[in-house]
Amino acid sequence: FKALGPQFVERTRTEPGCMHYAFSFNGTTAHCREGYANAEAVLAHLQNVGELLGQALQIAKIVRLEVHAPASEIEKLRAPMASLSPQFFALEPGIRRASEA
């Protein structure tokens, strides 16, 4: 699976709605942390990496898929993402910094 990581990153690099995207590893467990501008960007990403995701799911399983977004964006994702069985979390206002103050 780890060998597919750079391919995922390259495919994702030019997506205009992608805010951040990276993999981290702990032994044989991979974590992909990604953020998108809106639901449409999430769906565009899934379409863009669909072939790679199919390859990845042949050799690995999704242990947990969390989607954190405003409730209005979650509603746009429920049906299209149903086959991935995500957990949805309604995001409340908070703080987000681009860099340290």
Question: Each PLM stretch: what is its role?
Answer:
Residues 6, 26, 41, 93-94:
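Short linear sequence elements within intrinsically disordered, low-complexity coil regions
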Residues 13-19, 35-88:
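An amphipathic, aromatic/His-enriched active-site/gating alpha helix that lines ligand/cofactor pockets
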Residues 83-101:
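Vicinal oxygen chelate
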Residues 21, 63-65, 97-101:
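Repeat-unit-sized solenoid/scaffold elements
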